[in-house]
């Protein structure tokens, strides 16, 4: 096991090195080049206090807030404030003198008791996934807008099948049967984070982004890959799985990763012992994926979110070779394997720029503005189910968000331009997004 700040590796690209082993000052500069990128699952694990146990069920984090009593405790201050406001509105005669509920007129007393009972029943019936974020937790551009109605997927949509080497072939047999009808597929990957940072002279900012992605994809191995299938309207099969989480063979003792990343991944629910013994061989996975009917077919629509790393790991697996030296060759390979795909991050960014034209004018604001998948899901009214924090759940959330956004917008941007204009464009790699 190796910390990412102790022994940087050396990778030559165009005569330059990705890491310098010469001086400690250069290592310090590399540490300040940018924050390490983590997946949503790892980011959630970073929020856990040290020493707090994390319960997992079927590889997903089991949130303990399903307990109605804990949920009531969490919302009790807000509920008390609402009750006080209601009492003030319903008690115009109470000026300066506190009046107990027992001393109120009979009709008002019964009304208040009924309202309190209804509020308590609603609080008890609400699960964790149906809780909307508080106003203080929302982005600024959402605080002044009315919340959309909740889009509640059917229960069978929220099932994620864990795939190990023991059931790899049987699950791909299911995928082959579904592809002809459910030809929209989303992908999400889990890896240890960005450890490599290129140094040297680059042709552009886009070239730097590609070389960073290229270094990390060549350097690291994926831990999990999520796939989810639906039709163009977001419909899924009534019976059986339509979202899968593929668990690859991964031995932390042989991989390059920091101690911090290892602990965060363990907290997020990754069972490295099981990955080491029961994990899927990535090249066996690539052969089955090529025969699944998903690849090299323009009738299949791929959905990603900030696609660079997801597509990078997938192309690296399918090629069984090092990443291409330049982004043009990489894009060629992507379009060969996936001729029809959308980067939902780019689509969401363009929609937000139509809503806030000043974002297009200020490059500094563009860098500060974050367009996360969770924020998009909140705007679309998708509840925050705990399954969405897993790798397979992330692919499911991408697919649900894209299909819901397409239905609400009729697959068009606010100016009437069709989403197809940005088909096959990778956010951060193609152009200066």
UniProtKB/Swiss-Prot annotation:
Region (Disordered): 78-98
Residue positions where N-acetylmethionine is found in the record: 1
Domain of life of the organism encoding this protein: Eukaryota
EC number: 3.1.13.4
Reaction equations catalysed: Exonucleolytic cleavage of poly(A) to 5'-AMP
Keywords from the named record: Acetylation, Activator, Cytoplasm, Exonuclease, Hydrolase, Magnesium, Metal-binding, Nuclease, Nucleus, Phosphoprotein, Repressor, RNA-binding, Transcription, Transcription regulation
Subunit note: Subunit of the 1.0 MDa CCR4-NOT core complex that contains CCR4, CAF1, NOT1, NOT2, NOT3, NOT4, NOT5, CAF40 and CAF130. In the complex interacts with NOT1. The core complex probably is part of a less characterized 1.9 MDa CCR4-NOT complex.
Protein's UniProt name: Poly(A) ribonuclease POP2
Organism encoding this protein: Saccharomyces cerevisiae (strain ATCC 204508 / S288c)
Gene name, Swiss-Prot/TrEMBL: POP2
